[in-house]
Amino acid sequence: MFRDGITIKGNKEGLNVIININSFKDFDEMLDAFIAKLSKGKRFYKGCTLRITTQLKEINERNTRKLKDILFDEFLIKDCIFEDSDENKSKVFSGIYEGRTKFLRRTVRSGQIIKYSGNVVIVGDVNPGSEIYAGGNVIVFGILRGDVHAGSTGNDKAIIAALRLQPKILQIANRISRAPEDDDKPDYPEVARLKGDAIIVEPYSPNKFNI
């Protein structure tokens, strides 16, 4: 029998799901309980933003992806935000910036503006004419061609990374860079960061960036 380890509350941003992962014997038991709870009002969650607060250190990356896939594919939620129940131990982006993360699994289209106080992770493209503002890092698993501002609250340790980094305007903290006029567009992942007073862009290396 499932323990009462999942609470769902409404807030102005959407729905907050509080999961006490330690109330369950393992991740699969928690997932079964979560699905059963959501299934009671499945259509209610369509288009909603879910903020999931739990002990992130107890959930590995594979299970996090599994949970997100179910929420997006079966319940058709709009956004999914993971938040550590112990913010001081949040390990979402260990080594560069630790904090809350907003996940978007869609294309950000022209005219759309995304703002968040923590990290922003986008699984999809960011089209020209769109704008991304993050207090932490901006990570795009796709082509980034819009305007992007990481470290918007002054965090000069923030980075911007994408599979194809082609923004019109790129800003980290209070430093701004514009796209070059030439047509040379690398076809490999790149990372932008501050070095001194300038923004530098370099190929992504897993040995150098722990993201």
From Swiss-Prot:
UniProt key word Thylakoid: no
Cross-referenced HAMAP family: MinC
Family classification: Belongs to the MinC family.
Name of the protein in its database record: Probable septum site-determining protein MinC
Keywords associated with the record: Cell cycle, Cell division, Septation
Assembly notes: Interacts with MinD and FtsZ.
Annotated InterPro entries: CAP/MinC_C, MinC, MinC_C_sf, MinC_N_1, Septum_form_inhib_MinC_C
Gene from which the chain derives: minC
Any GO BP: cell morphogenesis
Role played: Cell division inhibitor that blocks the formation of polar Z ring septums. Rapidly oscillates between the poles of the cell to destabilize FtsZ filaments that have formed before they mature into polar Z rings. Prevents FtsZ polymerization.
